[in-house]
Amino acid sequence: MPKQRSVVPLNDVDDAFRLFSELLTPSVTDVRGETVFVDIGDYVHLMQEEQRLERISWVLETLTNPEEIRKGHRKETPFREVYINRVYRSEHDMEGEPFVVGVNRGFLGLDFRTAFVPRPSYLTQIRKGQLIWKAKN
């Protein structure tokens, strides 16, 4: 099945915790059918930047409808996998924004680590990681 365009509006920061609890905890099944575990400590991490809180809904969209998944590009985190997506704020948004979700592969499944809009130079670095999965066009 071809990838669906990811159209997800920004959420209100005041709704972030409710959305986090409803959409992501205790786990999400990703595009490959794997379980990604999410816990309250992950929300504390996301709270560090308002931009991340406004994009809670983008985390679910990126885990379930990514453009690609790559192995981590950093030698110190060989167990990291990164979901890459372009998310559009509305049907009228023609550019969208890149969005990445990082998870760590553990013994029991995948553990959520982070999610953010990467700088273009950092996205280039992420894309140096080995391709694990790619959406069909």
Question: What are these regions, as identified by a protein language model?
Answer:
Residues 1-137:
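Ribonuclease/tRNase effector modules and their secretory precursors
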